[in-house]
Amino acid sequence: MQFELNAQARTLQGTGASRRLRHAAKVPGIVYGGAAAPQSIEVDHNDLLLKLKKEAFHSSIINLIIDGKKEQVLLRDTQVHAYKPLVLHVDFQRVDATHELHVKVPLHFVNEEVAPGVKLNGGLVNHVMTEVDIQCLAGDLPEFIEVDLSSLKIGGSIHLSQLKLPKGVKIVHHTADDSVVVGIVGKGGASEEAAEGEAAAAE
């Protein structure tokens, strides 16, 4: 999915200037990275807020148009109000085609309802992770990674090493362990063996 966001260069700095921007429905921000110097910007609040509600915006290359000049960036951070739907600040990082990115992308779980552990044994899906760190070139960046649960039984789980990754995408491991991504557990914590025993007794 392609996203485009218009911005203007920002020259005034400081708390007072940022407050005036917010009163004018603008969000102060910064663009950094690459060979160019960091640049302060301002973007329309409502436009940014609408885009932030879209999951793909957080893990897609964004065409940021600053005073008519296009740069490709990633959303890196947002500061939001504690209880109001207000964006207070936004950070973007420049990207290029030749340098690998390190970014979090969401996991999309499919076929949960037909997984044997759920459909046949009434198990519960336990989502241990909802996103994963990946490394890839900008052109290979996926909006999400799909996790198929169609063959998962009670007590079964899917680990990071079992994820089907798009071409050019690598998982960034933070520990030596092959962490669990998702599993199916019995309603009473039943193991796979116990569930199979109950099924055999029923037959």
Curated annotation (Swiss-Prot):
Highest taxon listed in the record's lineage: Bacteria
GO biological process: translation
Keywords associated with the record: Ribonucleoprotein, Ribosomal protein, RNA-binding, rRNA-binding
GO cellular component: cytosolic large ribosomal subunit
InterPro entries: Rbsml_bL25/Gln-tRNA_synth_N, Ribosomal_bL25/Gln-tRNA_synth, Ribosomal_bL25_b-dom, Ribosomal_bL25_C, Ribosomal_bL25_long, Ribosomal_bL25_short, Ribosomal_L25_dom, Ribosomal_uL5_bac-type
Pfam families listed in its UniProt record: Ribosomal_L25p, Ribosomal_TL5_C
Bilayer-crossing regions: none
GO molecular function, one term: 5S rRNA binding
Role according to the record: This is one of the proteins that binds to the 5S RNA in the ribosome where it forms part of the central protuberance.
Recorded family membership: Belongs to the bacterial ribosomal protein bL25 family. CTC subfamily.
Assembly: Part of the 50S ribosomal subunit; part of the 5S rRNA/L5/L18/L25 subcomplex. Contacts the 5S rRNA. Binds to the 5S rRNA independently of L5 and L18.
NCBIfam families for this protein: bL25_bact_ctc (TIGR00731), PRK05618.1-2 (NF004128), PRK05618.1-5 (NF004130), PRK05943.1 (NF004612)
HAMAP family: Ribosomal_bL25 (MF_01336), Ribosomal_bL25_CTC (MF_01334)
Name of the molecule in the record: Large ribosomal subunit protein bL25
Gene that specifies this protein: rplY
